[in-house]
């Protein structure tokens, strides 16, 4: 991952205020329910507090906040601003999931697909370590990458929404130009229209990490969690299409 805000894709910098047009909270209802049930079933107690690292525009949080008292951390000021408008009752903190240290622990920690921007072993292990440090003993952490090496397939998708006087349409293409390395490319083309004005076309390149299930489980375990993989269950995804990684922090953990 390129260091700092300047290394983020355009979607999280100059286009951040277009996020609500690209992606709506309603799109996240089903998967947020899956994550909520997984967090609750993994914890040794009924979790009350949840830290989300890489919380983005807050769409998952808009559902999870019905069940947890949430603190949301993201590197992008623009995305935090979008999330604050959607989730004013949640605490928002600007920070990097690799290095953030809030000085307190939470019953559970959640990292959604923002984890894919960890493009090296060092970056991913740092993010997992952040989750461990902030997780209360007996609590749970859930990591939800879009792909592992075992299930990656080249794919395309398209969609968009109208919102107020803005409209967006997009095309996305996930490809792996070099299967020998630990990254893949997620290319996005946005067509943006404001009011009755001209349509602007923007290309945005996302470089994403691609690791094996064994690497995920090993690094989560080495951080101190009891680790296992869980098939992601969603009506729009076939069985075995992707995995979610879960860490349970032992009740006897000292850190």
Language-model features: locations:
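Conserved class I S-adenosyl-L-methionine
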Residues: 1-48
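Class I SAM-dependent methyltransferase SAM/SAH-binding core
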Residues: 51, 57-100
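A short acidic, Gly/Pro-enriched loop at the edge of an enzyme's catalytic core
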Residues: 98-109
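A short SAM/SAH-binding and catalytic strip from SAM-dependent methyltransferases
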Residues: 107-123
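A short glycine-rich, Lys/Arg-flanked "PGG" loop and its adjoining helix->strand segment in the class I
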Residues: 125-137
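SAM-dependent methyltransferase
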Residues: 142-214
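C-terminal lobe and adjacent flexible extensions of AdoMet/dcAdoMet transferase-like proteins
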Residues: 207-255
